[in-house]
């Protein structure tokens, strides 16, 4: 029973046909192509999801089977217990029945769950089988598509390979054709551009030189005018300084007079105090006298008769004393009025001097402002003059370089014209030779016809021909000996070329030694200039330290000595003069430094020109050496090829006509380019700043000309080969027509000798050109090194000049600080003038108080006179 419960029909799922389909998947995947990997990955993902669902269903089935097994175990245990408890009571029977009923329910539930699980497993199995069938069908379709795609891909690959081969061949042909076309176009365009650029550059440089000369003359005139104005301003400054000194002397005289007046005023005040004390004493004595008089009035009546004479005498003494006092008072008043007049005169003189001092201070400030403005203008003018000098030097250097380039370009143009004329002459010579060869060909054809007509006669003369053949064999041996001689000459030429190379290397070593010596000299000059600059810098530092100490001492004196302000101001003016002189000295030293810098720049320009010339020579030497090596290799190749080349006379004629047409087309294009170059000769404005680029282009053009000469050499060699071919054909024609071809052979031999002489001349010129190119290449390298060293020296000199300018600016700033100190001193002078005015105001107040005292004194004197008169009148009445 348990065995039947444990066995489930779902176990057959593991042996379903879908698993066989899964087992066939790797083989199917192995035959897949790369194009179907995306669809296969999607199918694999779906299969993986289905497998995960299947695993979850398996786990659920196993769990249900475990629960069923547990329930079956419980059922077995319950049945055992039931069998053990059959002999128990009815209650146990009822309980057993209940348990059996529960077991029946559990069995039903278990069977229902099994049925549901089996249904679900069947549904899942069907779904899985359907999905697997769909996937297998899709995989088969994909395999079919993949096979079709593979076949199509192989076919397309074959087609692509064929097409790429065809395209490569077409591209090679096209590239070769484009190279040939571009080469010819580049030659014509570069020659025309070179001619027009050089002509435009020459015209522009001439115009620019004229314009710069005019600007230089204008600037020199302006500099002269500015110098005249500066001299006038310095003269005005000197006059203002003299006026200021005179005003200061007047101010000092006024100060001395004022101090004397103050002393006199003090003395007058002392005298006034003494007069006041005397007046007080007299008033006290008067009060006592009045008191005594009041006391004596009581006794007058008693002593009237007795003292009449005495009273009269006393009255006369009082009158005398009053008269004396009035006289003294009048004298004092006259002295006070004289002093007041002097004080008013001094005040007027003081106000006049003060106004003059203020005017002079204003004039001094204006003069200082104008001096500062003129100094700034002078600095700006000096800067502009220096900039213009630098610009003029640069332009002169550029002008010289452009002139040199123009001369070189004109020489190159002349060479090109000569080459062109030579090419025209060669063309004409080739045309004449072509005509001669055509005539020779016609004659050879006629001779061949004659030979055909006389063929039967030649058969009779076979024996004679055999002898002539032997003679021709001997001639062939002689030609072989001549060929060996030519090979020996070629070997000797190679040996001479090797010797020339050794000589060029030796000269290059000598030039390098000269360059090293020049570099050492330049280094010594740089060291000397740096030492001079260091000395100048040390002197300037010492001068600045001395001026700093001096300024500090002057500041301390100005702070400590307020009373001696005028003397300090005079000393400050003297120091300003000294500083201006020192500034002039510094400016002179700066001008010397600038002159040295200018000399260095001139040396730099000269060295740069040398570098450019040497670099050009070095480049030419290099190109000549390369051309010599290539010519040697080409000569070897041509020597090897010349031994086995045979062509027809008709092909030679066709080649010559083609060359003639080609030369005519090139001549027409060159003539058109030359016309365009003459038309566009005046249309370039920006060639002055591209001197080095023009030099590089000139070198490239030189390379191109060398390539052109190489092409001409190749053409010449081809013509020589054609001549050799003509010789071979002439020999054949001689074999065919012995009698008619001797004249043609003689003509061709003369032509061969002419061509050999031309070849020797051309090789000699080629060797000379190579030697010149090597020299120019070596010279270019040496000059390039000199240019680099001179550029470094220029940078160092520029740095030192910048440092000197910074130091000069620092000294100017210190001079401005000294001027600010003088302005502070002037402000102190004005403050003291204000204090002096306040003191004068106080003196005016004292004078006004003195007037009040005088008025009171007069009023008191008049009152005393009136009182004495009334008393006398009373005494007379009493009498």
UniProtKB/Swiss-Prot annotation:
Residues 837-879 are annotated as: Disordered. One of its GO terms (cellular component) is myosin complex. It comes from the Eukaryota. Signal peptide: none annotated. Keywords: Coiled coil, Cytoplasm, Motor protein, Muscle protein, Myosin, Thick filament. Paramyosin is a major structural component of many thick filaments isolated from invertebrate muscles. The keyword Coiled coil applies. InterPro entries: Myosin_tail, XRCC4-like_C. Residues 37-860 form a coiled coil. It comes from Onchocerca volvulus. This is Paramyosin. Belongs to the paramyosin family.
